[in-house]
Design a protein with these regions (language model features):
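Conserved beta-strand-loop surface patch within small alpha/beta domains used
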Residues: 1-128, 137-219
Length: 219
């Protein structure tokens, strides 16, 4: 574990508020998990750019014997019309100097310092929105140690945790509900942003595409 004296610095969180924005639902495909309702979620909605998704999956697949992980970087917004919070993950920062094994990943002090330096140097003006790590051959869930990391280093209501199972190609986000609770097994899908008319890059086979019924359609 890591000392509480060193936390991932994400800005002045006490005074931080999401900037107004327009949720880009029409520019994205919504992927649902078995725990998701087809109706719009009430809590935080997660959008991910193609480049961030590809790089995250590439890092996850780089070691199928040990857990790897890092930070999710991007913007935190609130839809001006619906007042619903959402985040756009634009990049990932693979963590260096970690201690890892087949069933554990620990961020060291050097890991946290490097993540903060990389955030400031490479992505000024962006936030650390959460973290990701892999569970090779173990499934998509948050272990007791994962929950400890999330609660101590990603305590804000808008922080998310992404777990990827690279062997079976599965993945899912863990998002706190409006009361601040987090279910370590009930993961959610995400909104995959599409760019330049290109199709989906999704490789996680445990998620299904949302079926959108146009207004006035018969379904």
């Amino acid at each position: 574990m890591i000392s509480d004296s060193l936390r991932i610095r994400i800005g002045d969180s006490d005074a931080m508020q999401p900037a107004p924005g327009h949720m880009p639902v029409r520019q994205a495909i919504r992927w649902l998990s078995a725990y998701d309702s087809p109706s719009p979620a009430e809590g935080m909605r997660v959008f991910m750019t193609p480049s961030a998704y590809v790089r995250c999956c590439a890092h996850a697949g780089s070691d199928l014997m040990h857990e790897v992980g890092g930070a999710l970087v991007g913007r935190w917004r609130m839809d001006a019309a619906t007042r619903q919070p959402y985040q756009v993950i634009e990049a990932v920062l693979p963590a260096r100097h970690t201690r890892h094994g087949p069933a554990h990943l620990t961020f060291t002090q050097d890991s946290l310092v490097a993540l903060n330096e990389d955030l400031e140097d490479r992505f000024p003006g962006r936030l650390m929105l959460g973290w990701y790590h892999t569970h090779p051959r173990m499934g998509v869930f948050l272990s007791g140690q994962d929950l400890w990391i999330h609660e101590h280093f990603f305590p804000e209501p808008w922080h998310v945790a992404l777990v990827i199972e690279p062997v079976t190609r599965a993945g899912g986000f863990f998002v706190r509900d409006t009361a601040g609770r987090l279910d370590p097994h009930a993961y959610t899908g995400f909104h995959e942003l599409l760019r330049d008319g290109r199709g989906s890059l999704r490789v996680w086979t445990n998620l299904r595409q949302e079926v959108v019924v146009e207004e006035g359609g018969t379904g």
